[in-house]
Regions:
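Catalytic cores of nucleotide-sugar-dependent glycosyltransferases that transfer UDP/GDP/TDP-activated
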Residues: 1-364, 368-452
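Active-site phosphate-binding/coordination module
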Residues: 487-578, 674
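Non-catalytic pre-domain segments flanking phosphatase-related domains
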Residues: 425, 429, 433-476, 493, ...
Length: 745
C-alpha cells in the first residue's frame, strides 16, 4: 500500500440526492440506503491513516424543488473527504431512468476535473449501474483499478416484475432495463473487484450475469455508525419523537411493531398491515408504527409513493386500525435512531417485509438499538440474522405466517431479551465501519500491488501535438468520399487557415493503409492523427507514429486466438481474407444473414467462455470483434485527454450508427443531412447541429456554424430540447452500450 496519507480514492454515486448530512432518505425511490451507505463509507475511508483524499462524485442538481445543497459544486466532509457534484444534462432533478442519455456528459466533465486537478485516482469505485457505466470508462481511460458495487441489479428487478406477469416491453422501457443490464454486464467485466454486502447477492443475483466471475467477488458487509444507534437505556428518547408517534395511539404502553422504509411497492408495507390487521391479538395488544418517508399531501407524492400510501390508508380503514397504528407525516434524519429506541423501550420488534432487500441497513440499525428483528428471507438479512442471531427470517409473500411470527415474537419475553442482547453484540462484532474499511483497503492494496503499467494518462503528460487546442474528427464512408471537389477544397482551406490551433483527425473502421490511400486520392486535409479499425489503433502525424500506450490499454484481457477458436465453430460467419482485412485488435468476418446467429447471440457465446470483447455488425454482412476497451468514442476521449483538449473543443462529424457513442457526451457534433436512421433520435440532443447539406459540405457548414476556428459558440439550432422543460419521459433509451450497428465506413 502507498505511504500513509497517500491514497486517492474516488467513488461514483450518480443518481438520487446526496449530501454529507441530513440525507433525505425515502424522499423518492432513488434516495435510499445506497446513498447513506456511500456517504458513510467515504467518511470512514477518509479517517484511515493510509488515505489522503476521498472524493464522492455525484450529479449536480439546481432545482427550486430541492435544497440548494445539491447545487454546490463541492462539499467538504472532513478528514480529506469531499462530495464533488458534476454537471450532466439538465439542471433539474431527474429520476435515474432518465439519466442514461446524460452519462457521457458526466464522464466528460469528470475527465476534465481530473485534468484540472492534475491528479489521477488510485482506485475508482462505482455504485449502481449508471455509475458502473461511467466508472468503467473512466478507469479504462485513466488506467487505474476499478471496483463495482451494483447494490440493486437490473436482472433481479426484471425477474420480480415478470413474476407478477407485468408486460415485459413496458417494464423494460419504463425502467430502461436493457441499458441498465448491459451497463452492469460491462461493469462486471471491467471490474478488478466486485464488492458485495452479502453472500446471497453473489449466489442468487450476480451469478445470473453472463460476465459473472466468482474469483473477483468480495463480500464485505458495510458498517453502522454505532455512535448514532444505541439501546434506550444508553440514550434518551426525545419527547418530540415520542409525541410524533403517540399522537395516533390510544394505548401507548403496548409493544410496538416498527417498520422504516420508503413508500415503494418493493418494500411490501401493505403485507405488514395485512398481517397486523388479520390478528385480533395484535390489534388488541400491540401498536403498529409505519415510518415511510415524509409527506405533506399524498396527492403531491410521486405516482409510486402515492399508490403505496393509498393502499396503506385503505388497509388501515378496512381493518379499522385507528388508535393502534401510527403513521407520522414528517421526521428529521436524526429522529430515525430514536424511532428504533422507542420501539425497543416498548419491547417491540422491527419488521423489514421487503420483497427483496439487497443488503438491509435498517436491520443492522435496529440490532444496534437493541431491537429484535423480523426480516425478509430474500436478500441481505439472511447474512445479518445469521451473524447476529437476533430474530427470525420471514417469507414476505406469506401474510398468515408473518401474522403468527409477529404474535410469537411479542409473546416470549425471555426470547426478546436474548434477541436484544445478541443483536447488540453481533453488530459490534460484524458490522463496524472500522472493520469494513480495514478489509476494503486490504483488497485495494492488492489491486495496487498488481499494477505493472503506469497510468495511461499520467499526471505529468500534457500533449503530443503541442499547438492544437481544438480538433475536428470525420469518418471516411464511401458516400462521404463522393463529395464534390468544391466541398473538399473548402474543408482543406478551412483547416489550413486555422493552423496550428485546429487539428484534423480521422475516425474510421477502415485500416490505416486504406485510410491513407483514400485521403491522398480525394485530396483531403492531411490528418494530425488517425483512429482506425473502429478505435483499435491510433497513429499520429505524417510519420504515422503508433500510440503504444493505447495498444497496451487495448491488450487488457484480449485473447484473439481463443476468440477465433470459438467462432470457427459458428455457422454462417467466415474470416475475411486479403491485405488489411485482419488487425492485431480487430478480427473481421463475413456474416451470412439468416444463417449465422444474431449478433447478440455471438456476443453471449463469447461471454460464456469468459472472452470479453465487442461484437460489431455493419451493413448486415460484416462482423467485427474488437477489444472491450476500443471504440471511436473512447479513443477520441483518450486522445483529447492526452492532448489536454477539453471535450467541448472536440467537433465530431456524425453520419452513421457507429457514431452514436460520440454524440451523447460533451463533444460538439455535426449531423450530416444524409445521416442514417439510427441517428434520428440524436437530433434533439444538445450540441448536435443538423446540417442542411450532405457529405463534406455538411461538415464545413457545421464548422462554420460553431465558429470553430474562433471563439466557438453553440448555435441556437444545436441547443437541443429545452433541458429544463423537456418531458423526461421522452428520454431516448441508451443504445446497446457495447456495440453500435452502423452502415460501416
Amino acid at each position: 500500500m502507498k505511504n500513509p496519507k497517500d491514497l486517492y480514492l474516488v467513488h461514483l454515486s450518480i443518481h438520487g440526492l446526496i449530501r454529507g448530512e441530513n440525507l433525505e432518505l425515502g424522499r423518492d425511490a432513488d434516495t435510499g440506503g445506497q446513498c447513506k451507505y456511500v456517504v458513510e463509507l467515504v467518511k470512514a475511508l477518509a479517517k484511515h491513516e493510509s488515505v489522503g483524499q476521498v472524493d464522492l462524485f455525484t450529479r449536480r442538481v439546481i432545482d427550486p424543488k430541492v435544497s440548494s445543497d445539491y447545487a454546490q459544486p463541492i462539499e467538504a466532509l472532513g478528514n480529506g473527504a469531499f462530495i464533488r457534484r458534476i454537471t450532466a444534462g439538465p439542471k433539474r432533478y431527474l429520476r435515474k431512468e432518465s439519466l442514461w442519455r446524460h452519462l457521457d456528459a458526466f464522464l466528460d466533465h469528470s475527465l476534465a476535473l481530473f485534468r484540472e486537478n492534475n491528479r489521477i485516482p488510485d482506485v475508482i469505485h462505482a455504485h449502481y449501474a449508471d455509475a458502473g457505466y461511467v466508472g468503467s470508462r473512466l478507469a479504462s481511460l485513466l488506467g487505474c483499478p476499478f471496483i463495482f458495487t451494483g447494490h440493486s441489479l437490473g436482472r433481479t428487478k426484471l425477474e420480480s416484475f415478470l413474476e407478477k406477469e407485468v408486460n415485459r416491453e413496458k417494464v423494460e422501457r419504463r425502467y430502461n432495463l436493457p441499458a441498465r443490464i448491459e451497463a452492469e454486464e460491462l461493469a462486471l467485466d471491467s471490474a478488478a473487484l466486485v464488492c458485495t454486502s452479502t453472500h446471497q447477492e453473489v449466489e442468487q443475483q450476480y451469478s445470473v450475469y453472463e460476465l459473472y466471475a466468482p474469483d473477483r467477488m468480495r463480500v464485505i458487509p458495510p458498517g453502522v455508525d454505532i455512535s448514532r444507534f444505541a439501546p434506550p437505556q444508553e440514550k434518551p428518547i426525545p419527547d418530540s419523537v415520542a409525541s410524533n408517534i403517540e399522537r395516533f395511539l390510544d394505548d401507548t404502553n403496548r409493544p410496538v411493531v416498527l417498520a422504516i422504509a420508503r413508500a415503494d411497492e418493493k418494500k411490501n408495507l401493505g403485507a405488514l398491515v395485512r398481517a397486523f390487521g388479520e390478528s385480533e391479538f395484535l390489534r388488541d395488544k400491540a401498536n403498529l408504527v409505519l415510518v415511510a418517508g415524509n409527506r405533506n399531501r399524498i396527492a403531491d407524492l410521486n405516482p409510486g409513493a402515492r399508490k403505496v400510501w393509498t393502499e396503506l390508508l385503505q388497509l388501515i380503514d378496512d381493518y379499522d386500525l385507528y388508535g393502534c397504528v401510527s403513521i407520522p407525516k414528517k421526521h428529521e434524519p436524526d429522529d430515525i435512531p430514536a424511532f428504533y429506541r422507542y420501539a425497543a423501550s416498548k419491547k417491540g420488534v422491527f419488521v423489514n417485509p421487503a420483497l427483496n432487500e439487497p443488503f438491509g441497513l435498517t436491520v443492522i440499525e435496529a440490532a444496534a438499538s437493541g431491537l429484535p428483528v423480523l426480516a425478509t428471507n430474500d436478500g441481505g438479512p439472511r447474512d445479518i440474522l445469521g451473524n447476529c442471531q437476533n430474530g427470525n427470517l420471514i417469507d414476505p409473500r406469506d401474510v398468515p405466517a408473518l401474522t403468527r411470527t409477529l404474535g410469537n415474537a411479542l409473546s416470549d419475553a425471555e426470547q426478546w431479551e436474548s434477541w436484544s442482547s445478541r443483536g447488540l453484540d453481533g453488530v459490534r462484532k460484524h458490522y463496524t465501519w472500522e472493520g469494513h474499511v480495514k478489509r476494503y483497503l486490504e483488497e485495494a492494496s492488492g489491486l495496487l500491488e498488481a499494477i505493472t503499467q503506469p497510468h495511461l494518462i499520467t499526471e505529468k503528460l500534457r500533449t503530443t501535438l503541442p499547438l492544437a487546442d481544438r480538433i475536428v474528427f470525420s469518418g471516411l464512408e464511401d458516400d462521404l468520399l463522393e463529395s464534390d471537389e468544391a466541398a473538399i477544397a473548402e474543408l482543406r482551406e478551412l483547416c489550413n487557415a486555422n493552423q496550428p490551433n485546429l487539428g484534423f483527425g480521422i475516425a474510421t473502421g477502415r485500416s490505416l493503409q486504406m485510410a491513407r490511400a483514400l485521403i491522398e486520392k480525394h485530396g483531403l486535409p492531411e490528418p494530425d492523427l488517425y483512429i482506425t479499425q473502429l478505435g483499435a489503433a491510433i497513429h499520429y502525424g505524417k510519420r504515422l507514429v503508433p500510440d503504444l500506450s493505447w495498444e497496451k490499454h487495448l491488450n487488457h484481457r484480449w485473447e484473439p486466438d481463443a476468440i477465433m477458436e470459438i467462432l470457427d465453430l459458428v455457422e454462417g460467419i467466415e474470416l475475411q481474407e486479403g491485405p488489411g482485412r485482419q488487425h492485431q485488435f480487430k478480427i473481421s468476418y463475413n456474416y451470412q444473414k439468416g444463417v449465422a446467429p444474431r449478433r447478440r447471440e455471438i456476443q453471449k457465446l463469447l461471454r460464456e467462455h469468459q472472452l470479453p470483447a465487442k461484437v460489431v455488425l455493419s451493413q448486415g454482412s460484416l462482423l467485427d470483434v474488437v477489444p472491450l476497451r476500443s471504440g471511436k468514442g473512447q479513443a477520441i476521449r483518450y486522445v483529447a485527454m492526452r492532448w489536454g483538449i477539453p471535450a467541448d473543443k472536440v467537433l465530431f462529424y456524425a453520419r452513421r450508427g457507429s457514431d452514436y457513442e460520440a454524440l451523447s457526451g460533451q463533444f460538439l457534433a455535426v449531423l450530416g443531412s444524409d445521416h442514417s436512421l439510427e441517428l434520428k433520435s440524436t437530433t434533439s440532443l444538445p450540441r448536435v447541429f443538423l446540417a442542411s447539406k450532405p457529405n463534406f459540405a455538411g461538415l464545413v457548414e457545421g464548422i462554420n456554424a460553431y465558429q470553430f476556428g474562433g471563439g466557438i459558440k453553440v448555435p441556437a439550432s444545436a441547443q437541443g430540447l429545452d433541458p429544463d422543460h423537456a418531458d423526461e419521459k421522452e428520454a431516448v433509451l441508451a443504445p446497446d452500450m457495447e456495440v453500435h450497428v452502423s452502415d460501416g465506413d
